[in-house]
Amino acid sequence: MTIVLREMTRDAADAILAGERPGGVRVADDYPTEFSAGVAQCVGAVGQFGPYFLQRAEDDVVVGEIGGAFVDEEGTIEIGYAVVESQWNRGYATGAVEALVTKAREASEVRRIVAHAPLERPESGRVLEKAGFGLVQETEDEDAEGNVVRVKQWELAT
């Protein structure tokens, strides 16, 4: 199944931040995700790469989102993504990461892409591995609520 990246609009982001479903797009029954509000806050921010809705090509239904942000002056972006639980294990996350990597490789300012996968979600690490990322280290990061969590850091040179 194919995923298309569709840029998240300001109107869609405002709806998500208000706790509503975005208008103008069809969404999966269990959308938005816990990740959605954080992604919506990034719309229009300087230094962002995306964010994008993950839209199934066959029916245009939104099943998640993906985006990245520049984290240093050397051209490193850190990406994050989420797929609604009802659509897990269908290749959508891998397709989305691969599509974002393709976009990143087309942008001359992007030199390196990093991602963190929580230890309790090994399937996220497999997604990154399938997309060509290499495991760098196990480290600590903050989750959406500001809690420190153990993660695996993955990296891909462009």
Regions found by a protein language model. Give the residues of each.
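GNAT-family acyltransferases
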Residues: 1-78, 82-86, 102-103, 107, ...
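A generic structural signal for short
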Residues: 72, 89, 112-113
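Conserved acetyl-CoA-binding loop-helix of GNAT-fold acetyltransferases
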Residues: 81-83, 89-104, 126-130
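A local structural micro-motif
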Residues: 95, 112-113, 136
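Short loop/turn and capping residues at structural boundaries
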Residues: 98, 115-116, 139-140
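Conserved GNAT acetyl-CoA-binding A-motif
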Residues: 107-116
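Conserved beta-strand-loop-alpha-helix junction that forms the acyl-donor binding cleft
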Residues: 115-125
